[in-house]
């Protein structure tokens, strides 16, 4: 039903007479963008399949030149996604992540509150070493469920919901403060590079976003879990004994540590995070050095690669077709942004970008809004980078689970009811917006983000 409505809306836009201020080419571009973003939003097809349809329709009907449609493939950010997918597969195959999870969780199974803290911290740590959000969800949720069972929490119990939701909320929301950790971050970085030739460096992004949207939000998730899903642990299993690390685990640890060091120091050596990730991914499958066979490479899930490429292509199409300029004028008039009123501008743009995620999904939000960043910067008087970074503040907040595809994957994996998830998601979003936006503004003011 919803998919049919989206398709009908797109067809109507494609064939109706141009509205005031629009050309026939702009109407066709708008129709394709509505189709693509709409199908992502309603989940009509797997995200990567919708992305491939975007490429196909754009080229068959000559909606835009190939260098616009496939612009995402020129971005180092897209290759960060590929490297991250390979590393995620390697982490799973070697058992390294399971080992880390046992080390982090087992000692805390005597206390529910301590176990919640351990789960949140583990999700944050994994965000640094495992770039794919879906991969972290698929890895962490079964381990958290097992840890919950060791602490006496049966499937469907209050403690079970608390632990699994803490893992899912942290995996996505705190991961938005770490550049390679989530798809929206990568789409934003790719859009900044392809649209404005403005690279977002790993360390710089970490400084701007992680202190508040990573660490402080992690603390907020812990408190929300304790409050909305209180429980008491009763250990039912003895402490686990870990075997010695395998040679594959040792080699993979070395690869991940080296990649992390190079990511953090990218401002010094100038090698983009994407090429570091790609090198690390290649190292994982090289003979002797690597930890995966050639055949295992074929089992890497490449869907996210084409999904991100399509989101970057939609962003470039929005800009090159002139739609971004028209949308920017409309948004500026609606929000009534004022030069010099930084706090008001910051709050309005953050709220706008947060709500936009409900209609576009959070991964697609930066693809849709990044082309408007220059307009936001011009009206507010901010540097372009600040306008772009404000988009990340918006997609770091999840109002509804369908905004975040990995969240939906985790809910299905853990068999969580949608309504029960909203019990925590909506209050957490409200508290986060009220408490964290002023704190984020103060932090950005301190580091000179507003010029």
Which sequence ranges carry the predicted segments?
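Transmembrane alpha-helix interface/packing and boundary motifs in multi-pass membrane proteins
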Residues: 37-46, 122-132, 168-179, 262-268, ...
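Hydrophobic alpha-helical transmembrane segments in multi-pass integral membrane proteins
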Residues: 183, 259-263, 311-330, 433-444
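Alpha-helical transmembrane segments of multi-pass membrane proteins
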Residues: 113-127, 153-174, 200-208, 342-355, ...
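Membrane-embedded alpha-helical segments and adjacent helix-loop junctions characteristic
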Residues: 18, 35, 48-49, 53-154, ...
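Flexible hinge motifs at transmembrane-helix junctions and intramembrane kinks/re-entrant loops
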Residues: 19-27, 35-52, 69, 246-250, ...
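Juxtamembrane and boundary regions of transmembrane helices in multi-pass small-molecule transporters
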Residues: 1-16, 21, 133-136, 154-161, ...
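Structural signature of hydrophobic alpha-helical transmembrane segments
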Residues: 17-31, 74-86, 135-137, 212-217, ...
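Lipid-exposed faces of alpha-helical membrane segments in multi-pass integral membrane proteins
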Residues: 4, 8, 31-38, 53, ...
């Amino acid at each position: 039903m919803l998919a049919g409505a989206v398709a009908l809306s797109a067809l109507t836009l494609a064939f109706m007479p141009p509205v005031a201020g629009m050309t026939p080419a702009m109407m066709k571009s708008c129709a394709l963008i509505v189709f693509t973003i709409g199908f992502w939003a309603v989940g009509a097809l797997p995200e990567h399949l919708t992305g491939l349809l975007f490429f196909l329709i754009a080229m068959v009907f000559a909606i835009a030149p190939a260098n616009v449609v496939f612009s995402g493939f020129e971005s180092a950010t897209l290759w960060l996604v590929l490297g991250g997918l390979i590393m995620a597969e390697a982490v799973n195959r070697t058992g390294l992540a399971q080992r880390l999870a046992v080390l982090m969780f087992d000692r805390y199974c005597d206390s529910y509150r301590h176990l919640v803290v351990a789960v949140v911290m583990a999700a944050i740590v994994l965000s640094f070493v495992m770039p794919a959000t879906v991969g972290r969800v698929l890895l962490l949720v079964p381990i958290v469920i097992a840890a919950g069972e060791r602490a006496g929490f049966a499937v469907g119990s209050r403690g079970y919901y608390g632990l699994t939701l803490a893992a899912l909320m942290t995996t996505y929301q705190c991961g938005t403060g770490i550049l390679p950790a989530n798809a929206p971050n990568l789409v934003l970085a790719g859009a900044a590079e392809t649209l404005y030739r403005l690279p977002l460096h790993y360390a710089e992004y970490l400084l701007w976003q992680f202190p508040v949207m990573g660490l402080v939000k992690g603390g907020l998730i812990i408190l929300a879990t304790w409050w909305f899903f209180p429980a008491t642990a009763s250990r039912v299993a003895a402490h686990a004994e870990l075997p010695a690390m395998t040679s594959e685990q040792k080699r993979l640890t070395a690869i991940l540590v080296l990649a992390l060091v190079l990511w953090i120091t990218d401002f010094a050596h100038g090698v983009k995070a994407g090429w570091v990730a790609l090198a690390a991914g290649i190292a994982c499958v090289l003979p002797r050095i690597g930890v995966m066979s050639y055949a295992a490479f074929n089992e890497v899930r490449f869907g996210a690669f084409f999904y991100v490429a399509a989101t970057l292509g939609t962003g470039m199409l929005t800009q090159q077709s002139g739609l971004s300029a028209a949308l920017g004028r409309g948004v500026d008039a609606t929000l009534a942004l004022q030069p010099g009123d930084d706090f008001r501008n910051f709050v309005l743009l953050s709220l706008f970008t947060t709500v936009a995620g409900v209609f576009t999904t959070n991964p697609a939000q930066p693809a849709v809004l990044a082309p408007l960043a220059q307009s936001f910067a011009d009206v507010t008087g901010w540097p372009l980078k600040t306008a772009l970074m404000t988009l990340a503040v918006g997609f770091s907040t999840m109002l509804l689970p369908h905004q975040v595809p990995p969240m939906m994957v985790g809910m299905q994996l853990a068999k969580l009811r949608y309504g029960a998830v909203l019990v925590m998601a909506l209050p957490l979003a409200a508290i986060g917006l009220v408490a964290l936006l002023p704190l984020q503004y103060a932090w950005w003011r301190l580091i000179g983000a507003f010029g």
